[in-house]
Amino acid sequence: MNQEAAFRHLLLMLQLVMLPAVTPVREVVLGKAGDAVELPCQTSQKKNIHFNWRDSSMVQILGNQGSFWTVGSSRLKHRVESKKNLWDQGSFPLVIKDLEVADSGIYFCDTDKRQEVELLVFNLTAKWDSGSSSGSSNIRLLQGQQLTLTLENPSGSSPSVQWKGPGNKSKHGGQNLSLSWPELQDGGTWTCIISQSQKTVEFNINVLVLAFQKVSNTFYAREGDQVEFSFPLSFEDENLVGELRWQAQGASSSLLWISFTLENRKLSMKEAHAPLKLQMKESLPLRFTLPQVLSRYAGSGILTLNLAKGTLYQEVNLVVMRANSSQNNLTCEVLGPTSPELTLSLNLKEQAAKVSKQQKLVWVVDPEGGTWQCLLSDKDKVLLASSLNVSSPVVIKSWPKFLAITLGGILGLLLLIGLCVFCCVKCWRRRRQAERMSQIKRLLSEKKTCQCSHRIQKTCSLI
């Protein structure tokens, strides 16, 4: 009896020793919350046989009866199915839809043998100042709003997490990635790569930062010219209300230049400062045209855009160049906010600069004759240029004498013409008078002749 008990004990020990060798290999499958996943179940027999899927509590999830599947009473009963077209090949996958992190666990597939599959479901959530998202692949936030991406993983798992931002730049953040002040360049596709048990799953989130595009916010124009203010945006399909308020250089308060709306990608002007005659196009990008720039417009403004998610601000600067020439002076100045790195210069065309200063006003006394150029430059880049034609100084200095000579000549000519006219009139009057005297003498002569003839005839008749 003791020998029989000892034999049974030995047999039990042998079974325990051999148990790890027959334990089925557990396959690991990674899934993403909200997606569908397929748990494999493969048999060596290439035909349709009976199978059953069970959870870790041995509750039936899904099985088959011939060519039909049957659904058990598990909590997954409304989210599971299988692929019948694979049954005849000895494959009986379990498809779980609309995955949740709570679906993570061990699943058993019973066929001619038992197979184990471990499902690990991960979820990526995003939170920012004006909202939150779970499982969404598209996020919109204003520039400057803090964004936090958090990975939710099943209990007991220890995945390796790697973050990659736009431009394939790697970020190290562990289970959380925080962008405290997202800029325009942070917009794009962010990828979270999760690795566990030599399996990998990725989350891709498209982040759109609602902001002004990175372009210069300083505009340069010559007095009298037209200038166009352009403000390209990183978005087109957001409705908004905006306005541009302007504070001229030296002014104590700002003035509303224009207000507008953007609805369904169409811009409409609400109000505008009439003297400016500002023009705005109906289509994006956002553009304002000032037909004629005056020096008093030089200054700074604030463009405000009110969106449903918040407010965007953009500073705007206008620099105006004014060039003048007088009899003895040539001046050039710029008005408005300028950087101290800019250089204002005056020089004759195709010659070295006569005056070049890091100031807002330059001038030349008694400038040489020719074409002068006023240049506002940022190192080798010319931002503004204006040309002035100056007459030769010799001509300018002799101008009074030339004017006196010219006026004297004109006056002498007028006197000569007057004298000639006077002489001509006098001669004409003398000639007229002579003609009249000659006519009178002729008439008198004819009268005397007539009288003598009459007297002779009378004497003859008396005789």
Swiss-Prot record:
UniProt note on tissues of expression: Expressed in macrophages and a subset of T lymphocytes.
Modified residues (Phosphoserine): 438, 445, 461
Keyword Cell membrane included in the entry's annotation: yes
SS bond partners: 41-109, 332-374
Keywords assigned by UniProt, alphabetized: Adaptive immunity, Cell membrane, Disulfide bond, Glycoprotein, Immunity, Immunoglobulin domain, Lipoprotein, Membrane, Palmitate, Phosphoprotein, Repeat, Signal, Transmembrane, Transmembrane helix
Transmembrane annotation, as ranges: 402-423
Glycosylation sites: 123, 168, 176, 324, 329, 389
Post-translational modification: Palmitoylation and association with LCK contribute to the enrichment of CD4 in lipid rafts.
Primary residence: membrane
Annotated GO CC locations: external side of plasma membrane; membrane raft
Region (Disordered): 153-178
Pfam families linked: C2-set, CD4-extracel, ig, Tcell_CD4_C
Regions annotated as coiled coil: none
GO biological process, one term: maintenance of protein location in cell
Lipid attachment points (S-palmitoyl cysteine): 424, 427
Membrane topology, as annotated: Single-pass type I membrane protein
Signal peptide bounds: 1-24
Physiological role: Integral membrane glycoprotein that plays an essential role in the immune response and serves multiple functions in responses against both external and internal offenses. In T-cells, functions primarily as a coreceptor for MHC class II molecule:peptide complex. The antigens presented by class II peptides are derived from extracellular proteins while class I peptides are derived from cytosolic proteins. Interacts simultaneously with the T-cell receptor (TCR) and the MHC class II presented by antigen presenting cells (APCs).
UniProt domain comment: The Ig-like V-type domain mediates the interaction with MHCII.
Subunit: Forms disulfide-linked homodimers at the cell surface. Interacts with LCK. Interacts with PTK2/FAK1. Binds to P4HB/PDI. Interacts with IL16; this interaction induces a CD4-dependent signaling in lymphocytes. Interacts (via Ig-like V-type domain) with MHCII alpha chain (via alpha-2 domain) and beta chain (via beta-2 domain); this interaction increases the affinity of TCR for peptide-MHCII. CD4 oligomerization via Ig-like C2-type 2 and 3 domains appears to be required for stable binding to MHCII and adhesion between T cells and APCs.
Protein's name in the database: T-cell surface glycoprotein CD4
Organism from which the protein derives: Canis lupus familiaris
